[in-house]
Regions:
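Rossmann-like adenosine-cofactor binding region
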Residues: 235-301, 439-445
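NTP-dependent small-molecule kinase module
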Residues: 345-358, 378, 382, 470-471, ...
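ATP-dependent small-molecule kinase phosphotransfer cores
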Residues: 392-440, 445-447
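A glycine- and Lys/Arg-enriched "phosphate-lid" helix/loop adjacent to the NTP-binding pocket
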Residues: 451-488, 492
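Phosphate/diphosphate ligand-binding glycine-rich loop within oxidoreductases
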Residues: 91-192, 284, 290, 296, ...
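NAD(P)-binding Rossmann-fold cofactor-contacting core
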Residues: 220-236, 391-393, 397
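Adenosine-phosphate binding glycine-rich loop
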Residues: 280-358
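Domain-level signature for soluble enzymes in the chorismate/prephenate branch of the shikimate pathway
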Residues: 1-90, 476
């Protein structure tokens, strides 16, 4: 006679089913949004009662005996929700290639009163899109910001000055355009306490992002601004002579962006009065440029805050609050250009936190034998993230385990190979990563560990560590290794989680998982 499942097992099964339903519901609502856009484009009504009744009957015929009595009621509710979703005002983000855009998620977190789609178009399709009437408006990204500006009947001052539009609204028979990027940049500086008033600012790059940045710098009262690029008067050959007195540097180029994260344009030590660095790149979250600035004790800020804040101002325009949007970044307002109402700032910060934690890896460092690998495995299981154990990745890439390489070729060769693995995996997003205990022995790895991760240092009592199958621990001794590495564990991490011995391993893992995920809320 087979054992009957207990209540916890049944509830666990129900949780798995509910998660699957939720995934399918997300797919269904996305399809409904696309159907709504199609119907608008072709002048069709959203509600088709005859099709709905046919659908109910077909579902009842194929339903199992447990669900059949509830099918009509369930799908009636589902279709009512779907119609509501299709009837929402339609907005989106316009670009040419948008596979990795975060805009739909950001706007869903700001306002659920409108739907938001990805709108990929070729240049020759822009005119038809602007005339189609399918969308009430959209954000505009590379490479169409200047095209959008030319197609607008009315422009805000930022768009007129920069010649670049990133927010379009179709209203009262007119095409209205805004540039909200400059407000995003103002917010990005302000939240980190970086002031440019009466200061000399060097801007790297001359593209669309740079034009919004120059407008913001003027709005904030910068004393002098320099443009540096390959073909400008100030270029990367003479920048130290021509702009060596810069107090703030802003990177508006894609240099340092994933996947080419290793690059940085300047030697910051050659700017003797430099106070702060800003980077409009948001992936990775801590670029090489910013980490080099941090190492010099400078203030820094990354591009995710700019992305989210500009989207917030756009969301107010889409929601019909153009007056409220007009107060954001307005130098003529009573409180100045940097003013953001407390409620708005709280919401912007909440969305930044959600996206930052989703994009960043959960990366665990600490002594060999402290439980990093199993903890990472458990966190991956709980969160659904992909697990990368760098020791396992090492063996898969090189065909030998770390222990075998150390035994056969020595520690130095192993460390060089380990650096390759760190550079390959750590700049990626959304992973759970367990690092080898000695990853901190090579300073070059600090950039990779920190560039796109929330870094957790797992600290355990030395008596709780095992040196089984750990040749470095066996050779040098746990105590000596700890003394050599502890300062780097402390300075490389964002959070330290410390635990004594537990009677049961599960108690340790459950506590550690709760603590780590709790810090990311």
């Amino acid at each position: 006679m087979s054992e009957r499942p207990d209540l916890n097992e049944l509830r666990g099964k129900l949780d798995e089913i509910d998660n699957s339903i939720l995934d399918l519901l997300e797919e269904r609502m996305a399809a409904c949004r696309q159907i709504g856009n199609y119907k608008r484009e072709h002048g069709m009504d959203v509600y088709d009662p005859s099709r709905e009744e046919e659908k109910f009957k077909a579902l009842e015929e194929i339903a199992g005996f447990e669900s059949r009595p509830y099918v009509r009621e369930l799908f009636k509710t589902l279709m009512d929700i779907s119609k509501d979703h299709q009837n929402k005002p339609a907005f989106g983000v316009l670009g040419r290639t948008l596979a990795h855009t975060y805009s739909p998620e950001i706007h869903s977190l700001f306002d659920s009163s409108y739907s938001y789609s990805v709108i990929e178009r070729e240049p020759e399709e822009l005119e038809a899109l602007f005339k189609s009437g399918v969308f009430k408006g959209f954000n505009v990204t590379i490479p169409y910001k200047k095209n959008a500006c030319a197609m607008c009947d009315e422009l805000d001052d930022a768009s007129k000055t920069t010649g670049s539009v990133n927010t379009v609204l179709f209203e009262d028979g007119k095409v209205k355009g805004w540039n909200t990027d400059y407000f995003g940049f103002i917010y990005m500086l302000t939240r980190k306490g970086i002031s440019v008033k009466d200061k000399k600012v060097l801007v790297l790059g001359t593209g669309g992002a740079a034009s919004a940045v120059f407008y913001a710098l003027k709005t904030l009262g910068a004393a002098e601004t320099y443009a540096c690029d390959l073909e400008t008067d100030i270029n990367y050959s003479n920048v130290y002579d021509r702009a060596g007195d810069a107090q703030v540097i802003v990177n508006c180029t894609p240099v340092g962006m994933f996947p080419k994260v290793d690059n940085s344009l300047l030697d910051l030590t050659r700017f003797p009065v430099l106070e702060a660095c800003a980077d409009v790149v948001y992936n990775p979250s801590r670029t090489k440029f910013l980490q080099e600035a941090e190492a010099l004790g400078l203030k820094t800020c990354g591009g995710l805050a700019m992305l989210v804040a500009q989207a917030y101002k756009s969301s107010r325009i889409f929601a019909g609050d153009t007056a409220g949007a007009g107060l954001l970044g307005n130098p003529d307002s009573e409180n100045g250009a940097a003013y953001v109402p407390a409620e708005a700032a709280e919401l912007i910060e909440k969305v930044i936190k959600v996206l930052e934690n989703r994009m960043r890896n959960i990366t665990i460092i600490g002594m060999p034998g402290s439980g990093k690998s199993l903890l990472a495995r458990n966190i991956a299981a709980v969160t659904g993230r992909t697990l990368v154990d760098l020791d396992i990745a090492f063996a898969e890439k090189f065909g030998r385990t770390p222990a075998e390489v150390i035994s056969e070729s020595g520690e130095d060769e192993f460390r060089e190979m380990e650096c390759e693995i760190a550079a390959e995996f750590l700049p990626k997003s959304g992973l759970v990563v367990s690092c080898g205990g000695g990853v901190v022995t090579r300073d070059v790895n600090k950039f990779y560990v920190r560039c796109n991760s929330n870094v957790f240092y797992l600290e355990r009592p030395l008596t709780a560590l095992t040196d089984k199958n750990r040749p470095i621990s066996q050779l040098h001794g746990v105590e000596k290794l700890y003394e050599q590495r502890k300062d780097k564990y402390e300075t490389w991490c964002d959070y330290k989680v410390s635990y004594d011995r537990f009677e049961e391993k599960n108690d340790f893992y459950n506590r550690a998982i709760a603590d780590i995920l709790g810090k990311l809320k």
